[in-house]
Amino acid sequence: MKPLLDITDVSLSYHSLSGETPALSHISFQLMPGEFLAIVGPSGCGKSTLLNLICGLLRPEQGQILLDGTPVTSGDCRIGYMLQKDHLLEWRTIYKNVLLGLEIRRELTAEKLAYVNQLLSDYGLDKFRSAHPSELSGGMRQRAALIRTLILEPDLLLLDEPFSALDYQTRLSVGVRH
């Protein structure tokens, strides 16, 4: 079986006036289809940097990152990435926020809208579809951002600090459902 994600000898340094700071050095691993991987470590150890490399927001100075055998590029639709901050648009309702990726991709089909409604129900946000982000708790906002990512049905799902504001029950259900 071919790996879904293949990272080989990836390195990256941040450049500043005071010199170079290594962020990641010679990272290699594979992720097979259906596998889960948790990257844990203290603040500043490079977890978010690695996720930014995997999704193509950053380019490695060395090494390669392949998704299903092809190089990852910025804006790769095969990757869903939920950032640390939810980045919900305050002027849009929760429902409109969740639809954003589908609108951009022009994928607003009846099937996708039914899936949106199912996810809103599954994650306890169906009664808040007309609310704006400022009206929701941190955990509810994070669930909305998760739904916005899941609705695009990516081949690879990257979650940066995904559970920091989620309650225990929601944390348990994320891996079970998706």
Region locations from a protein language model:
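Conserved signature/switch motifs of ABC ATPase nucleotide-binding domains
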Residues: 131-134, 148, 152, 159
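Helix-to-loop junction immediately C-terminal to a conserved catalytic motif
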Residues: 55
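The feature captures the beta-strand-to-loop junction immediately N-terminal to the Walker
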Residues: 40-42
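Signature (C-motif/LSGGQ) region and adjacent switch/coupling loops
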Residues: 20, 75, 95, 129-132
